[in-house]
Design a protein with these regions (language model features):
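Ser/Thr-glycine-rich phosphate-binding loops at phosphate-binding pockets of nucleotides
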Residues: 11-12, 35-40, 44-48
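Charged catalytic cores and adjacent phosphate/nucleic-acid-binding surfaces used
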Residues: 1-15, 21-27, 91-104, 121, ...
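A short helix->loop->beta-strand "cap" motif at the edges of active sites that frequently abuts
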Residues: 34, 79, 178-180
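Short polybasic/polar patches that bind polyanions
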Residues: 30, 75, 176
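Non-catalytic positions within long, well-ordered alpha-helices that form the structural scaffold/packing
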Residues: 30-33, 124
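Active-site flanking residues adjacent to catalytic metal/cofactor-binding acidic residues
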Residues: 7, 40, 85, 133, ...
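Extended substrate/RNA-proximal surfaces in nucleic-acid metabolism proteins
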Residues: 2, 43-157, 162-163, 218, ...
Length: 240
């Protein structure tokens, strides 16, 4: 058996740019044949829908609510819902944080004050991994003079279904420079997006939570879903 998982998507509960709820995303991905999704809503410095004036504990619980809502539907459909987050750290650059949960966020109320390096160290200490999201995305809000943090991340998102031509090939070249974990993701923001089904990873077994997902990524047991095709290696992909 092969099980498809979305590694990068956003819900309207937590991401200001998203158009669908996490429950709607679960139903859409289930209908598209996925076994599960990883919900990676924008965190404190990103395009968040969560009130930044809330006390830290309430704010973090709000960031977790989209996941809890999605899991209710996921459990009904026997569909895996996994919590993660997308962290903007400056200059329009972002990393995907996998393997931490609400308890980690509540225990680290100084996250807004610490550097990315310190944040990554804490994620690693908690057993998580950090993936550079769309490292060469070129948009008006991204400072292209600032490169990705390839020195501290565990992996590279090589294929992003929302990227423009030319952006993913650069990510692939970066991924070749080290034994990185490589991911592919849709970066989907609405349940009606026709790109659902185009991106993700494919595993020979199911993963039910963030710890199991991280273990699978560290083991590199996954294949890649790129442009709707299942590939053994990312090098096989047409990223142009």
């Amino acid at each position: 058996m092969e099980y498809r998982y979305e590694t990068h998507c956003h819900s309207s509960q937590c991401s200001g740019c998203a158009k669908s709820t996490s429950q709607e995303l679960v139903r859409a991905y289930h209908a598209a044949g996925y076994a599960g999704l990883v919900l990676t809503d924008h965190f404190i410095w990103g395009n968040t829908a969560v009130d930044k004036n809330l006390p830290w504990d309430q704010r973090m619980k709000a960031y977790y609510q989209g996941y809890l809502d999605a899991k209710v539907v996921g459990d009904e459909l026997d569909f895996d819902v996994i919590y993660a987050l997308e962290h903007a750290y400056g200059d329009g650059k972002e990393v995907l944080i996998y393997g931490v949960e609400l308890d980690f966020l509540l225990a680290n109320p100084d996250i807004p004050e610490i550097t990315l390096d310190e944040f990554v160290d804490r994620v690693h200490a908690a057993g998580g991994i950090v993936i550079q999201a769309h490292p060469y995305r070129d948009r008006y809000y991204v400072n292209m003079a600032v490169g990705p943090r390839a020195d501290i991340v565990d992996g590279i998102e090589v294929y992003n279904a929302c990227n423009k031509p030319g952006e993913d090939p650069q990510a692939l070249e970066l991924a070749k420079t080290k034994d990185y974990i490589i991911t592919a993701g849709g970066d989907i923001h609405k349940a009606s997006d026709e790109r659902i089904g185009m991106a993700g990873i494919v595993l020979p077994y199911r993963v039910h939570n963030s710890k199991e997902f991280v273990a699978a990524m560290k083991a590199k047991d996954h294949k890649f879903l790129v442009n709707g095709n299942i590939l053994d290696t990312i090098a096989e992909a047409d990223l142009t």
